[in-house]
C-alpha cells in the first residue's frame, strides 16, 4: 500500500472513531482494546497521561484530572453561556485565560492548564496511532469531521488540534455529510433520493436532509440541538438513582464526585443493555459510606425518564423538512447515525413520525461518520478506485447573504440553504440624481431589514458618471466558493469600473446558537417584518412615481405639447409630495398610498391627455378629448429602485 494513505477521523464529543479506505473498501480500525470506537477522554495522573479507554476506565478514581467533552469547549470563549452552563456539570476545572477556556489538571505532581485544542489533539494523536498500528506505517493526511453547525472558529480550532497532533488536515467536513457519503457508496444508481440523516450521538444531535443523485450529494437543510445526546440520557438515569439512594438510605451522594462518577459508569452500561433487553441491573459495591447499591431498571421506566428528550428529537426533523421544503412523504431514506439511535424508543418515534417507514440501520451507527470521512480522504488523495471516482460533495450556506437597498431593506442574493459553491448577480441602480457612488453593505440573516441582520462587510463603488436617479446600472455579484469564502463585486456597467470585497468565514460569522436564534426570531418576527417591508415598498413606489412624473413633464420632447399651466400643476404637486416624503419618512403604508392616489388624480388626466393626443393634429386638439376626471388608465411606469 502506498505510504500516503489518508485516514478519516470522527472526532466525537464522547467517542471517536477512525477509518481508512484501501483495497476498494473502508476499514474501521479497532484500537488496542479491540474496540472500534475510542472514548474522547484524556486523563492525567501522578505518573502518566492516559488517552481513550485507559482514561475512561480510571475516571472514577481520578475525576478531577480526567478531561472529556473538549468538543464542547473548542473554538468557544470562556464567557460563552454554553461554556458557563457546561462547567457546572464537569468534575474537572475550567479556568479563564484571556477569555479563552483552559482545563486545569494536576499532572505528575504539577498544576497544568491545557487549551481545548490541546486536549482534542491528544485524542487525535491516539486515533492517528491506532491507524498507524493497523497500517504498519506513519500516517499524516486526514479528514476530520465536525457537527454541521460548527462555526468558523470551532472548525478552525478543530483544524488546529489536528495540526498539533501532527496531522495534515486535508479538509474539515460535516458529520452528516460524511454519513451521507458512507451511505451513498452503498446506494448508487437509484435516481435522485432524498435522505434524512438522524445523528444522535453522545453529546450532540444533528438532523440533515441530503439529496443524493448519481454520486452527487447536496445538503438541502440542517438542524439540530448542540446539547442533546447519550450523556443527557445518562444524566436522567443518574438523577433517578441519586433520588432512589436518598429514599432507600436517606443519604445524598450527589456531592461526592467519585460516587456520582461510578454511578454514571453503571448507568451508561445499563442504558446500553436496555437497547437489547427490557431490564438491566446495577450492582455497585460500596458506592457511598460503605453502602452497596444493588438495583435495577426497566426499559419502560428509562423511556419514561427520558420521554421529553426523546420527543424533542422530532422538532429538528420537522424544521429540517420545512427548510428543505419537503413533505415527510418525499423522504426516500432514513439513516440512523450515532450510538444513541440504537435506543428502541428513539427508533420507534422516528418510524412513527414517518408513518411506519423502515429505518436504514445497515451502517453501524457509531462508525458511519468515520466511514464517510475515510472515503472523502481517499477522494482528496486522488484515489482512482471507481467506487469513489465520481463522488461529489456539495454543502449549503447556513444563512441568506445579501445587501442593503433603499430604506434599509435586506435584498438577498444567495438564499439560506443554497448549495455552495454558487454565484448570483443582480442589477441595482442609484437612489438620487447625480449620485457619485454607491455603498455596498453585505449582510447575512433572515430578517427583512438589514438592521436586524449581521453586517459582514462594506465597500464603496465611486466614480459613477453624473446621471438621473435610476439610470446607472450597477451589477452586483455574490460568489461563494466551496470553503464558504464570499466574494462580492460591484461593477458600473457604463464605465466598467469595479470594486470588490472578500469576506472569509472568520470575519464575525455567527455561531450555531446565533444562527438558530436568528432563524427562530425570523419566524417570530416575520409578521412585523412583512408590515415594515410593505411600508418601505409603498414609500419607494410613491417616490419613484413622483420623480417619474416630474421628469415626464420636463421632457424636452414634450415642449409645446403640454400647456405651461398643466406642467406647473404637475411639477408643484410632485414637489409638494417630494417635500412631504422628506419630512415624513416614517409614515405608515396607507399614508404613502393615499399620497400616491392624490398625486395620480392630478397627474393622470394630464399625462393621459398627452399620450392620447400624441398622434393628433398639433397641440390645439388636446382640450377637446380630455377625459373627465382622468378615467383613462394612467401610464404604467416601471419602478426602478
UniProtKB/Swiss-Prot annotation:
Residues 617-633 have a biased composition (Gly residues). In response to cellular stress, acetylated at Lys-77 by NA110 and then gradually deacetylated by HDAC4 at later stages. Acetylation enhances its chaperone activity and also determines whether it will function as a chaperone for protein refolding or degradation by controlling its binding to co-chaperones HOPX and STUB1. The acetylated form and the non-acetylated form bind to HOPX and STUB1 respectively. Acetylation also protects cells against various types of cellular stress. The modification Phosphoserine is found at residue 631. It comes from the Eukaryota. SUPFAM superfamilies: Actin-like ATPase domain (SSF53067), Heat shock protein 70kD (HSP70), C-terminal subdomain (SSF100934), Heat shock protein 70kD (HSP70), peptide-binding domain (SSF100920). NCBIfam families: PRK00290.1 (NF001413). Belongs to the heat shock protein 70 family. The N-terminal nucleotide binding domain (NBD) (also known as the ATPase domain) is responsible for binding and hydrolyzing ATP. The C-terminal substrate-binding domain (SBD) (also known as peptide-binding domain) binds to the client/substrate proteins. The two domains are allosterically coupled so that, when ATP is bound to the NBD, the SBD binds relatively weakly to clients. When ADP is bound in the NBD, a conformational change enhances the affinity of the SBD for client proteins. May be an auxiliary component of the CatSper complex. Identified in a IGF2BP1-dependent mRNP granule complex containing untranslated mRNAs. Interacts with CHCHD3, DNAJC7, IRAK1BP1, PPP5C and TSC2. Interacts with TERT; the interaction occurs in the absence of the RNA component, TERC, and dissociates once the TERT complex has formed. Interacts with METTL21A. Interacts with TRIM5 (via B30.2/SPRY domain). Interacts with PRKN. Interacts with FOXP3. Interacts with NOD2; the interaction enhances NOD2 stability. Interacts with DNAJC9 (via J domain). This is Heat shock 70 kDa protein 1B. The gene is HSPA1B.
